């Protein structure tokens, strides 16, 4: 049985008497090397063979139907691409290589004295399908610390941006400028064989992930801390701890929150705008810097990465209108008035999920433990009790439950990060873990240029036998 097979089976067996055997087998199988690239080099040929055999046997098999509504409706529900690192189940929520968020919180290594999973461990899981050892996670931390320094032209660029340029515009531009450092772009121009593409994509991805906290912290300091220095990377600290230090936050609980935040926002299967964008642009053999920069331009859109800001704006308006302690009845009336005015309750509902987002749940658990009496958290908790029932009564929502954005902004505000325009940059730093892990596998498996067929409305009408008049 291959390791990836063991990894896929293990989560399903967590409640069985064989669970311990499979998890120990998974841990032992992954313990052979602390070098992530070496582990990948062992896994890739086996996965290439498995996918090749699958395509040969089932390549012509029909996997679904496409309706006119799907074509006009943003391709919702259309099975159209392969994305290995995570799968979103409408009832269960996200699974990272088969593992749920609670399972990741339990199984992934933590920092000394910490309780939240280290994002380095999640990245190892996303890339390999393996639950890493502490030694492997420490290797990733030190590897990213070693690769973190920014080239001088990117520092100069960031220092010369006007202060009215949005943080996400600065973030995307700086990532694009890092393209000057691309190992893949150089190797491709020198005629490297396509079987080696993944190796250079891996190197670029590791470099980029390592540098993102430095870029993000530099933007934060320039915009909100009078251009003060981000300081130096400490190779003895984990990725999140270095990030919070560079941002200027020393509260250990905030570092723990950042570890949780960067873990749970990392990936949400391949159809969302940022993941699909990186997949699409990468299919043109654009290097990881160009692919990820494009993804960040998608994330900056109000329908994708700005939702937690909208939640905070709505909560602040609610507080201003209703005051401090609010009765459930007044809250219920306010929600109904929001809906009757044609607006939505931000932070509730999801394009795919049909239950409470597990990313919301783990943030709620963090808040219950660390800030149970915070007025804004109490307001969020009260909404959780009331909003779903109101939405069910209204009868329009397919999913009346809260999503990840209903909670994240409140936690960041509590620890003093009140600059809402910056929140999407944090989202972007996290999302790199998932989309770049997938980008490595896309090149390893030889995925081709993405080129779907488009149709005009007249063409669709002709296809289905409808009159165009």
UniProtKB/Swiss-Prot annotation:
Organism: Kajikia audax (Striped marlin)
Enzyme superclass (EC): transferase
InterPro entries xrefs: Citrate_synth-like_lrg_a-sub (IPR016142), Citrate_synth-like_sm_a-sub (IPR016143), Citrate_synthase (IPR002020), Citrate_synthase_AS (IPR019810), Citrate_synthase_euk (IPR010109), Citrate_synthase_sf (IPR036969)
Binding residues for oxaloacetate: 359, 431, 451
Subcellular location(s) of the protein: Mitochondrion matrix
Subunit structure of this chain's protein: Homodimer.
Function: Key enzyme of the Krebs tricarboxylic acid cycle which catalyzes the synthesis of citrate from acetyl coenzyme A and oxaloacetate.
Span of the transit peptide along the chain: 1-30
Annotated active site: 304, 350, 405
Catalytic activity field: oxaloacetate + acetyl-CoA + H2O = citrate + CoA + H(+)
Miscellaneous comment in the UniProt entry for this protein: Citrate synthase is found in nearly all cells capable of oxidative metabolism.
GO terms for biological process, alphabetical: carbohydrate metabolic process; citrate metabolic process; tricarboxylic acid cycle
Single GO term (MF): identical protein binding
UniProt EC number: 2.3.3.1
Pathway noted in the entry: Carbohydrate metabolism; tricarboxylic acid cycle; isocitrate from oxaloacetate: step 1/2
Protein name: Citrate synthase, mitochondrial
GO cellular component, as recorded: mitochondrial matrix
Pfam families for this protein: Citrate_synt (PF00285)
Entry keywords, A to Z: Mitochondrion, Transferase, Transit peptide, Tricarboxylic acid cycle
Family affiliation: Belongs to the citrate synthase family.
Main subcellular location: mitochondrion
Top-rank taxon: Eukaryota
